[in-house]
């Protein structure tokens, strides 16, 4: 969603309507309850206009929009869903049972072809993410000492990410028990002679990520 529409907020859906030559973002504006906790925020329409999308509709509007498209005989393309709630939404929106939601092969191929190409701006973002990721690993090498706990090393790595306005690409693996795949426990004490495995990465606000092992 972020790649095609430039927004990263929960509860949004979008349609690229090729026949009508327009893009629509579906979502609900913040209520007073949200504003009390979060303060005044740009409206969904304002956020959408910043990324070049002029038309917004409430979340519920996507159902009638898709139903009309199906009635007109338009082909509705979608990517294979992997989250169960999205499978249920597609069943509600298009009447396609979860077992038959295989996605559109032409759409899949089009997305793959597009994502294989990287613009100069994208490459710069990827390089930034990799630079911050490398700095995280270097910091771990600089601070690690026998007697430290794994979580102390992880804290230093997280600090590097935060200092560069980055989130983590995924939960950090930093462990003396590298023989266990995807070990996210950080409570072991590091001893002299231990082999310390790190798999970690930084994610930029743009969504581009680094992923390195050391």
Residue ranges: model-predicted function:
Residues 1, 105-110, 148-214:
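Short catalytic-site patches enriched in acidic/histidine residues
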Residues 41-44, 143, 200-201:
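Short, charged/polar low-complexity linear motifs in solvent-exposed/disordered segments
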